[in-house]
Amino acid sequence: MSFTPEVVSRKSGVGVIPSPAPFLTPRLERRRPDSFSNRLDRDNKEVNVQVILRCKPLSEEEQKSSVPRVISCNEMRREVNVLHTIANKQVDRLFNFDKVFGPKSQQRSIYDQAIAPIVHEVLEGFSCTVFAYGQTGTGKTYTMEGGMRKKGGDLPAEAGVIPRAVRHIFDTLEAQNADYSMKVTFLELYNEEVTDLLAQDDSSRSSEDKQRKPISLMEDGKGSVVLRGLEEEVVYSANDIYALLERGSSKRRTADTLLNKRSSRSHSVFTITVHIKEESMGDEELIKCGKLNLVDLAGSENILRSGARDGRAREAGEINKSLLTLGRVINALVEHSSHVPYRDSKLTRLLRDSLGGKTKTCIIATISPSAHSLEETLSTLDYAYRAKNIKNKPEANQKLSKAVLLKDLYLELERMKEDVRAARDKNGVYIAHERYTQEEVEKKARIERIEQLENELNLSESEVSKFCDLYETEKEKLLDVESDLKDCKRNLHNSNKDLLDLKENYIQVVSKLKEKEVIVSRMKASETSLIDRAKGLRCDLQHASNDINSLFTRLDQKDKLESDNQSMLLKFGSQLDQNLKDLHRTVLGSVSQQQQQLRTMEEHTHSFLAHKYDATRDLESRIGKTSDTYTSGIAALKELSEMLQKKASSDLEKKNTSIVSQIEAVEKFLTTSATEASAVAQDIHNLLNDQKKLLALAARQQEQGLVRSMRSAQEISNSTSTIFSNIYNQAHDVVEAIRASQAEKSRQLDAFEMKFKEEAEREEKQALNDISLILSKLTSKKTAMISDASSNIREHDIQEEKRLYEQMSGMQQVSIGAKEELCDYLKKEKTHFTENTIASAESITVMDSYLEDCLGRANDSKTLWETTETGIKNLNTKYQQELNVTMEDMAKENEKVQDEFTSTFSSMDANFVSRTNELHAAVNDSLMQDRENKETTEAIVETCMNQVTLLQENHGQAVSNIRNKAEQSLIKDYQVDQHKNETPKKQSINVPSLDSIEEMRTLFSQNTLSEEHTSLEKISTKQGLGEANNRTPFLEVNK
């Protein structure tokens, strides 16, 4: 907070009449920056507003009524936890602050931990602000002011921030024995009006105006707040400040509410300004200025809970309005809004520099732990928590020169005296108060702008002078460096000359040493190569001996393998003979079984045909009986018709009764005839069904016999094919194993021969003359011996492989031929079986069609009889109904009916005869087809028997051929390699030892070499010849 009072305060006991001119801050001295500017740069960093939270204890009334506590404070972790449940809704929030003080905290601990560092900053020349914020009745005024001072002069334990800060400032300054001056102001903001609480009483004013002096609130050109009419009191001790604080507090507006017995109804600002003389190195005296603003805000108030009415309600509304504006300013600063509503309230205008300005600010948020104040407590915590994010840019106040300050104060005092004198004498210029105030404000703004520009000019000049000094310093350093560089170059040139001379001498010595070194190194290299060559030859000889031993071991393994092959082939021959015998027995059994099945099928076929012939004869006899019955019926009907015609002419009167009786007799006769005809037709139908079942049974039996024959033939084929495949696979595996064995032997022999020749040739080229001659002879003999042995073995293996391959190829051809013949036979058998099946199916289909035709015709006859019976019944019924009415007409039409009846029975007779003839023909045709089917089946059976016999003969011959060829291949043609007498015997080789080779080395004397090196060094030092050469030091060769 930065505001300027209008009038310079009075010394004690001396009253000064205030003038209309505002107080002007003394002009700064034009001077060069000092070391204090570094601290200004350090302090220009942004810092957050410090927020301290204090929770008051529950009051006595709250404790008596057992009000629940909803706030818990953790001072160590600096946390405040709000935990409460309202209508099944839980409130659980956690807040972190810079410092937290619980209900049991003391005034001294709060001041020492939170406020004392701020007072130190004030004494360092900064402007600082401390203000209390919170709900009414939470202890803001108690925190800022505290209890009354004791008479003895010591601060009580209840003393607040303001008295403790005053005592701290005075104690620090007195301890430093500093030269200082201090001024204080105390103002009140009530209902948006600023009043001076330290103003003197005036008898010309009313009792209300004596206590309240209005203060004008304005802003200068830089945005700082200017308070017109505010007086400053100069103080010399802490007791003076305590007295002023008690006097101003007594004038402050308070009231009794339900929440607080002494509730502050206004905001108060107590400001302490201190000027301290600073010690300097020269004669110049500087003064640093510090300012401490202690603000006690009125508490936010709930009108319903506080019981405020009328004027108190308006006061509460203004208080809440100003605090709400303060909250909006805090939100705008936290959210970095482009517009901050400072001008919405005088409170925020006064605190403008403390919130986001150049002042260090500390907020003390006070809350109540009671559940009744939960809403206000949460609001206070939210605003305080958001205020933590406000950033200020603290700047130390500019230091002043004491002489300039005294001069300005003297000029100001003289100007004020002239104004007082002019006012008494009424000799001066009088203008409107508003115009004068505006001109003074503009004048002050211009003066401050000029001062700012002068300060910037001074800073620029100081920087220019600083850079000039720096340039001169760097120039001097550059001259010194150039002189040093010249000396270094001269020394470097002399050192290079000496280095060249030393290099020439060094090169001459090195050339001599190189000659000796080359000679010794060549001798050493030749000796080393000889020893290495001898070692290599010895190693090669050892390898050759090992290889020969391996060769003999391999030959022993080959003999063992040949014996194993012979035993394996014998075993294979016995297994092959046993498998062929089993195959022959299986084929003979299958053939005999097939012959038996064919005979059974033939017997079933003969029995079926005989039974079918008997059934056909029976059918013919039944059809004849049916024809006789029908013929007798027709004859009876004709006789009856003639009798009716004779009696018709003589018995017309008795016609009714006689016709009725005759009709009944005709109905009975027709019913009997129909019954007999139905019985005959049913017998025919049953007989045909029996014939159909017998035919189907015979066909199924024949088909099952053929299927069994086909399955047995397939089983014979599969077993034969499996045996032949096994024979072929075994023979092929034997051939492949022998071939792989021979190839492996040949490859190993070739590799050994090539390796041995290469080693021998390499040894011949590298060995010395004598050793080379001995080794070449030994190598040539062994090479010839191994080549002969390997060539003989290879030729024998090739011949044996050819013979085995030819024998196995013959066996494979025989097995393949037998397999092909068997496959052809199976294909033929399958074709015959398919044809037989088709023929049987066709014959069955024909028989079924004939039987269905017979059944259809029998059903037609039955239907015809039923139709005739139904027509006669209908005619009789109609005739009975019309008999009484049409007796005479019936006599006339009797002849006509007789003719129709005769023609109808004639047509029926003819139709029945034709159908009976057709039935006889169908039965005869079926019988003929059965005979043809019998002949075909007998031919097929005879063919199958012949083919089975032929298969048996061919199979026996093929098995005999396979057995003969296997016996010839495995016993007669198989030969075993007989090479034991031709194989060379194992001989021992004399290999020289390493010690005998090491004895060939030439011994060198280390002393002789050392003497030669010493003499060479002395000679090279004396001569000093040669050019510079980058050579490594000479090393001893034999190390």
Swiss-Prot record:
Residues engaged in binding ATP: 134-141
Keywords: ATP-binding, Cytoplasm, Cytoskeleton, Microtubule, Motor protein, Nucleotide-binding
Domain of life from the UniProt record: Eukaryota
Compartments (UniProt record): Cytoplasm, Cytoskeleton; Cytoplasm, Cytoskeleton, Spindle
Region (Disordered): 1008-1039
Recorded GO MF terms: ATP binding; microtubule binding; microtubule motor activity
BP GO terms, sorted: microtubule-based movement
Recorded GO CC terms: cytoplasm; microtubule; spindle
Ranges annotated as biased composition (Basic and acidic residues): 1010-1020
InterPro entries attached to this UniProt entry: KIF11-like, KIF11-like_kin_motor_dom, Kinesin_motor_CS, Kinesin_motor_dom, Kinesin_motor_dom_sf, P-loop_NTPase
Keyword Cytoplasm: yes
PROSITE patterns in alphabetical order: KINESIN_MOTOR_1 (PS00411), KINESIN_MOTOR_2 (PS50067)
Gene3D superfamilies: Kinesin motor domain
Family affiliation: Belongs to the TRAFAC class myosin-kinesin ATPase superfamily. Kinesin family. KIN-5/BimC subfamily.
Role: Responsible for microtubule translocation. May be important for the organization of phragmoplast-specific arrays of microtubules. Plays an essential role in stabilizing the mitotic spindle. Required during mitotic cytokinesis.
Name this protein carries in UniProt: Kinesin-like protein KIN-5B
Species in which this protein is naturally found: Arabidopsis thaliana
